[in-house]
Amino acid sequence: MRAEPALLELKLDYRFNDPELLRRALTHSSLANENRPGAGVGSPLNDNEQLEFLGDSVLGFLIAEALVRRFPEYHEGDLSRLKAHLVSAAHLHGVARRLDLGSYLELGRSEEMSGGRTKKTLLVDGLEAIMAAIYLDGGVDAARAFVATHVLDAPFFGDEEAGTDIQPAITNFKSALQELAQTRRLPQPRYSVVRERGPEHSKTFTVEVRVGKEWTAQAEGRTKKIAAQRAARGLYERLMGDPIVPLPDDSPGDSPDDSGDAAESGVISAT
């Protein structure tokens, strides 16, 4: 039994001028294919597939626009990585679940019986269809407001199928910490070498990372780069509130040959 679409409008913070657009955005093709009355059999215009197609492009454009406006100092690579997370199925699935979108979908009997209301693909497709419906109903400003509230400023959603709300296979914690700070609109991480000890051929470095005035972590490593990664991992875990598998000395990108050039690794040597 699906919930009333009017209740979903309250969660979306948007009231449709044309309620038919919302109904169409919530209608899965399985309903039309089962030849139900009023389902618009044989007419692709009565399910959400075309809206999902449009919504995917609307979302990509609005996310890219918002990131360029919010972060004018970021390079293309930084923007691309952040955009990739925000438009990922994992993140959109989390957004859809927060809205309890599955309760509002119109499904055919086969999808209903197979647990379609909780299927990741159906929820993501439905969310993208809703974005398109809002765009068609209220214009780009309405769609922009929805994306800002429900996608850009949403909590950090990762790969829940791996049993956690964070990405389970992080190999570059500096990048992960930077993206997390961006997502939560926190200051960018700042790194500094606070201590060096040991002989020249076998030094140990202590690096501190700070995010604003409140968040900080320190870690040691046999290179500045390894120490920075470990410090980033420590602060990332604190911000996410979840432990992660320890980072080995020779993780990708952290070999001794990369002996930790401060400028390349983002570490600022202490004076």
Swiss-Prot record:
Q: Does the keyword Metal-binding apply?
A: yes
The record's Gene Ontology biological-process terms are:
mRNA processing; regulation of gene expression; rRNA processing; tRNA processing
In which compartments does the protein localize?
Answer: Cytoplasm
Q: Which SUPFAM superfamilies match?
A: dsRNA-binding domain-like, RNase III domain-like
The GO cellular component terms are:
cytoplasm
Q: What is its EC number?
A: 3.1.26.3
Stretches assigned to the RNase III domain: 5-139
This chain's function reads: Digests double-stranded RNA. Involved in the processing of primary rRNA transcript to yield the immediate precursors to the large and small rRNAs (23S and 16S). Processes some mRNAs, and tRNAs when they are encoded in the rRNA operon. Processes pre-crRNA and tracrRNA of type II CRISPR loci if present in the organism.
Q: Which of this chain's residues are annotated to bind Mg(2+)?
A: 52, 125, 128
Q: Tell me how this protein assembles.
A: Homodimer.
Q: What's the protein here called?
A: Ribonuclease 3
